[in-house]
Amino acid sequence: MNTELITKLELSISNLKEKKSRIYFLVQDTKGNAKASIRVIYEMAYHLFENGYNAIIMHEQTDYKGVSSWLDEKYMSLPHKPIEGQNLEISPEDFMIIPELYGHVMEQVSKFPCGKIVLCQSYDYIMETLSPGTSWSQYGFLKCITTSEEQKKYLEKIMKNVSFDVITPTISNSFEKKPIPAKPIVSVHTRDQRDTMKLIKSFYLKYPQFRWITFRDMRGLSEWEFTSILKDSF
């Protein structure tokens, strides 16, 4: 092993020990709309940031909207870097954490000389952008963080040569019950808004005597609006 290589290796080890290595988290631009999966990523990044690690939010376009309209302003204090038009600084001691939806990005960064980790929150999206017959390990992603033991068991059956760890999403203290009785409101949150409307209309048709009950679609609300309405609901 030559002197130059030894020097680079020692520098990488030093950066890891001193928490100088970069930890990139790729996020989707929700254009100001609330999305639970993005909140989870920001929570992870901010926790590392608070503990002295060099956590960086990575997004695709330069006109990134951010999350301050629906999450706490503190999350925008994290360093943010766009992929578009910039050469990301990547070293062997760095880490890149990519959501399961971004199979095409995994392919693009497969040659990067850094640690690569998949963050899988929804198994529905695993095959969305992966080429047929391709697994994460073929792109150098040998580790995966997922959100439940059940999902871990499912992933282990289909993604070989990958190690899995479970980190359960946190729930903020704002999700607490009110001491006073709830109002006759039923809060509904579905992935597809059409499912919400089907549920509401079907309920009123089947139980016309309960038309005094109000339904509230919880999509697109900020965290504080969401928790406030949820506290008032059945």
Each predicted region: which residue ranges?
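Extended catalytic core of nucleotide-activated donor transferases of GT-like folds
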Residues: T3-I13, Y46, I56, Y64-F141
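Acidic donor-binding loop of glycosyltransferase active sites
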Residues: S228-F234
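A short beta-strand-loop structural module common to alpha/beta enzyme folds
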Residues: N54-Y64, R211-R219
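A short, glycine/small-residue-rich beta-strand->loop->alpha-helix junction that serves as a flexible
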Residues: Q28-V40
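A short, active-site helix/loop in glycosyltransferases that binds the activated sugar's phosphate group
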Residues: V105-E107, E128-L130, F141-S163, K198
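Nucleotide-sugar donor-binding and catalytic loop/hinge architecture
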Residues: L9-R22, P79-H80, S174-I185
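Conserved catalytic-core segment of nucleotide-activated headgroup transferases in glycan assembly
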Residues: S37-V40, M44, Q151-F226
